């Protein structure tokens, strides 16, 4: 397997917790030892760690009558302190520091917040520090929540230009059939654009976490599409991280497309930030989706614009049937775009360098 200069490792709740939901210190310690060895070998590592709620559960008994949302907020707020203290002690044994990074979905949507977080990651990685990322459950509720930490890990991997995303769960990878059925086995490799195996995935979630294999498949394939090698493996297997870097492991590897620019990676993860919808004709769709020639979105191919936007805003692009084609950063506002719509010889609304095709 190719060498990776930068990794994002996501450790799921079922890897960090015992069957009773409390933290498994032995499992956490084993993974911390592997991460320390990887850093010692010269690879930068960002850790996305679940487990705060489980840590809180071991320390505090939530009063009766508390709502599910508030219960999660309280346990996470208490448990995050305990979780970080465990990591601090474990990494200190290797002469490493750890840094807490708590994120919300909004931090990845605003341009200023996004750049501030990215610069913080880059600064931390220059030193002997392991950034440890978790969702800020205290303020993340309902629509502001990530699907789970798999989604957060994918966003961090794209933001930091990581070469690989490793998602550790309590199973060996994606299976070709539901567990226990004849012929069920781990799918070793999946191309970034191959969705054939999605129907084989059992639609269930983990015991203590929010996500499941459907989510992992979607996140892994999206990361692979923007050029990030993505691996789903069993975090409870001995030396799993070391084995992955050696290329000798049990798990599912999503084969990546050619790596995209940082701008295109950001666009790929920002559907929710789009300010308006731009509809295009079949000719423009063919040009934009061509793999032989890079094309920008020209006004002559635009048929309709819904909503208003300014220069620099992200717009969602749809074809004549209303199916999503991609996202792009507008070079001018919607007023000018409506004036230019359908005309030849006008400047591109979205330049190819600022265009992501889904």
Residue ranges and their predicted role:
Residues 1-97, 101-358:
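C-terminal catalytic "cap/lid" subdomain
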